[in-house]
Amino acid sequence: MFQDAAFPDAKEQVRQSTDIVDLIGKHLELRRAGRGYVGRCPWHDDRKPSLQVNPDRQTWKCWVCDIGGDVFSFVMKREGCDFREALNMLADRAGI
């Protein structure tokens, strides 16, 4: 677990070490669509892919649920955890 003084640096280090396409692709089937990726949102009955992943911005968004964000918000939504727990999960995943 990160100390409060190291928290901002740890957050940025984890963000830079985690590719959003790789992270989301471990949980959802993504397919290339132009410069980004699309997949079926796990939070609603999604018949057509409405979740978009932008590798350039390192963000995701579901246009039906109107939710999205970065690697931290994806883990928080998927795991039902708070930011600090998501930070620690992603740090472990990145070997930080």
Regions of interest found by a model, annotated:
Residues 1-96:
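N-terminal structured subdomain of primase-like DNA metabolism proteins
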